[in-house]
């Protein structure tokens, strides 16, 4: 897992094509392998509820709660047959092993932390056009930041509305749980022991046509995701 990430750090500045090749290897091979290693050495389980994906169309927008940096490889593992592209803050594109160079090489949507909202919306609009053209699956975390207590925070509408208007795709609301307990990188290996990560599609919405429909999707998705988290937390970490 470590060597491709290190190699990609040096490849990206000098050869974008090579970096994209390495990034593709990281996405398709290392994301599943990462969770297999964690399972083997730390008894850390990954539960992807594959039956929940049966109702998905060919292309769609994913909206999800957000808990840790492991959310990105977790989604890559769950949707390993799809080309995912994430909406993320631009600081993630620097100095994060395994993630940063991959985000840049694969042209994920990097939202500038500094600058006007107009610039940010233009970045999202261009991203929406790009994923449609390339048949990719955009992934958005409407909370805008990682949760501190594991509960679902407020879903902000601006980025989702612009992406929905530009891409005009159905929306898959996905629940994710397990990352909030390891969001702090201190003692991460200890925190991983006997833990679990879960991902499930909780509802697929038709493409919203109005602002009112966009708001309804966000509100209902947040409610359904929190409900799913509450149900999961009644289970032991090793029970599906």
Spans of features found by a protein language model:
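Membrane-interfacial terminal anchoring regions of lipid-handling membrane enzymes
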Residues: 1-29, 51-56, 130, 179, ...
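Catalytic core of membrane glycerolipid acyltransferases/transacylases, capturing the structured
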Residues: 5-29, 56-115
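A short, well-structured juxtamembrane/interface segment
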Residues: 33-60
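Residue-level preference for the first positions of well-ordered beta-strands
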Residues: 59-61, 135-141
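Short glycine-rich anion-binding loops that position phosphate/pyrophosphate groups of nucleotides
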Residues: 66-68, 143-146
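A cross-family acyltransferase "interaction/gating" segment
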Residues: 98-100, 133, 137, 148-212
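Anionic-ligand binding region
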Residues: 127
